[in-house]
């Protein structure tokens, strides 16, 4: 398997994105000590050792590449406000799935119920799109409200079809339920761990700032690029010339579905605060 097309990243890139800024020393988790370089004396925040971060990040990128190469499902998870739009846009860009509103208990461990809710969402859409509906304007309005609520929670996983093969998580403290569910089902977790995080149960930890938008953008871009690289290699192995795919469109079979990603969009065709400041925020 040729990984030459994996995205490149350096310690300098990490530093420019503020990945090294941790939390106030009073908020640290002692289990993160191996990844801490020292303390910023003026602001009393921990500084993450980017020499430790880089190889762990590269290892995680290879994992995402391999899962994509094999046609697996990857779920991006990040519900903090700094990450909402980034998580969605990068997951869509690489034809994968995301949760960016709220993690519903049982999203993994009770997939049957979640699937039923997704079917309800689809049914609502059919009713709302039906011509010559016999429903009143008020009834349609109530259905639209229910549709919006379900779409907000489940829109990013509506085409996933089954539990994912790996999770990519921003902020394991906020997404602790997702971590626990993945651990219970033995689903590998790639996660960004800040200095206040618990590394226990994280299969592929990446020590780094999980509050700065600039840092989050870097992680998610690298994750999406690694996934696209894996898909590209898979296509090349099957004899498809990537240069022949129009408009930067990638096609990848997933079970009984074909995922198409085109200019930041994905469709499924069935076949049958740190920067919040700069980490020097006093609230940290």
UniProtKB/Swiss-Prot annotation:
Q: Name one GO biological process term.
A: translation
The protein's matches in Pfam families, at most eight in alphabetical order, are given as: Ribosomal_S2
Q: Name one GO cellular component term.
A: cytosolic small ribosomal subunit
InterPro entries linked to this entry? Ribosomal_uS2, Ribosomal_uS2_bac/mit/plastid, Ribosomal_uS2_flav_dom_sf
- What is the superkingdom listed in this entry's lineage? Bacteria
GO MF term list = structural constituent of ribosome
Matching entries from SUPFAM superfamilies are given as: Ribosomal protein S2 (SSF52313)
Coiled-coil ranges (or none): none
Q: Is Ribonucleoprotein among this UniProt entry's keywords?
A: yes
Please list the disulfide bridges. none
Q: Which family does it belong to?
A: Belongs to the universal ribosomal protein uS2 family.
**Per its record, how is this protein called by name?**
Small ribosomal subunit protein uS2
The species this protein belongs to is Wolbachia sp. subsp. Brugia malayi (strain TRS)
